[in-house]
Amino acid sequence: MSGYPGAGYNGGGYVPPPQPQYGGYYPPQPAYNAYQQPPPQQQQYMVYHQPSPGPQQHQHWNPQQQTPAPQGYGNPPNSHYGRPEANMPTVNSNSYAHGNHQAPPPPPQAPQQFGYGAPADYAFRYSQCNGRHKALLIGINYFGQRGQLRGCINDVRNMSSYLVEHFRYKREDMVILTDDQQNPMSQPTKQNILRAMHWLVKDARPNDSLFFHYSGHGGQTKDLDGDEEDGYDEVIYPVDFRQVGHITDDEMHRIMVRPLQAGVRLTAIFDSCHSGTALDLPYIYSTQGILKEPNLAKEAGQGLLGAISSYSQGDLYGVANNIMGIFKKATGGNDAHARTLATKTSPADVVMFSGSKDDQTSADATIASQATGAMSWAFINALKKNPQQSYVQLLNSIRDELQMRYTQKPQLSCSHPLDTNLLFVM
């Protein structure tokens, strides 16, 4: 069971948006006492496909812009995302394992090296994704606030249903935070989001598969620790950000990436503006599968990453302090890049698909008369059309779904060097 209060949608269907309280959202919530079992998840939310999304672009969000006229998301249309003809592949059941050696091979089980320049005892492992599955899904429409969105809650419904129907996820192992829920613990406040992030990675073991999905406003703020080449941190905006502030990529990396052991998978989907490096993952790939960032040895230099070999001894939290001591005088450019590579790599298997690069906005879309995020729709639809895809094939498929109507270019990033020709499993 999830062990998280307020997980999911209160059982019997979603409730209407809450009446505005404290500016359209609930005041900061008191701390949880003991984690409790969530209510049963009985409502099955439908998911959708067929028409391509209409071009409804929202530009980079200015929190001071005027609130649009409220637009409800309405009842779900009758169309569905259809089930794929074959089940989603696993490491043991896939086209390659069944004799088609032209298909993408499953991930290897042996430890993998980061490459020249990294300590010999510092390795990562691909997850086999056959352990426990947990998911955290966040959708924020910002009801009654400036910059209100229409499709983010629908994104969460669609994604949660897709995970349950096509992967090994269970409702009781999901936490869903949306701003249409009456339970204060299920509101996407900053406190609830941070607590849920800790819940997601708690007690994760090798070959577990964790899933994080965020649909809402994203933006940029001035970088304060010198780890961003462009001088800006990427941020997400909780529903109560005007009172308690945003959440930075540094904080999300510290909570959800740094504690993970080798062989734990975290798959993250960000459907927000300026989200290309929202988890601060140092390896970034193009649609051709080419590493867009220089490799570890070129930037960091041989021996520079010696301190992070403490990962292999289990000292996951002492790593950053050691490395930051080496780089404390670095300010930008190549030095900032080297610091990012030194502190943001991980022996875990963290993969992120984002709706846009750091300098791009993302789009709201309309699909079968339902508002939804373009990236969330494209991810589901691409896998529905072809479950047996490599990472680079999936990235290309997502871009193919978007390119006819949108300028945004989704991006693939990873915590370790990624063989993009391997089978995508989750």
Curated annotation (Swiss-Prot):
Low complexity: bias regions: 21-68
Gene Ontology MF term list: cysteine-type endopeptidase activity
Pfam families, per database record: Peptidase_C14
Family: Belongs to the peptidase C14B family.
Root EC class: hydrolase
E.C. number(s) listed in UniProt: 3.4.22.-
Region Disordered, residue ranges: 1-111
Official protein name in the record: Metacaspase-1B
Active site: 217, 273
InterPro entries (alphabetical): Caspase-like_dom_sf (IPR029030), Metacaspase (IPR050452), Pept_C14_caspase (IPR011600)
The entry's keywords: Apoptosis, Hydrolase, Protease, Thiol protease, Zymogen
A biological-process GO annotation: proteolysis
